[in-house]
Amino acid sequence: MSLKTSFDENIKQKHKIEKPKMYKVILHNDDYTTMEFVIEILINVFNKVPANAVKITFDVHKNGIGIAGVYPYDIAATKINEVKKLAYKNGYPLKLTMGEV
């Protein structure tokens, strides 16, 4: 037992943990999705406070795109899929894309 313990103590392990690549979730403007729906998804899916959700919504309306948030790939993809399902269920053609930061 002591042999194993001394052996384990002599092993130097270097664990290099890399930060995951981050991706921005981009909302695209369209002529059909209501601003109220966009604000709702920003609050409920992307956990934005109402004032920030309104600002992002106006960015989308004014500039054609807006950043909903920045996340690791899996989280960004999950949020995009969740919003696409909600948009489809509510009859909106809301487009979201993802871009590496």
Curated annotation (Swiss-Prot):
InterPro entries according to UniProt: ClpS, ClpS_core, Ribosomal_bL12_C/ClpS-like
GO biological process, one term: protein catabolic process
Pfam families per UniProt: ClpS (PF02617)
HAMAP family, sorted: ClpS (MF_00302)
Subunit structure: Binds to the N-terminal domain of the chaperone ClpA.
Membership in a protein family: Belongs to the ClpS family.
Protein function: Involved in the modulation of the specificity of the ClpAP-mediated ATP-dependent protein degradation.
The name this protein goes by in its record: ATP-dependent Clp protease adapter protein ClpS
Taxonomic lineage: Bacteria, Bacillati, Bacillota, Clostridia, Eubacteriales
Gene: clpS
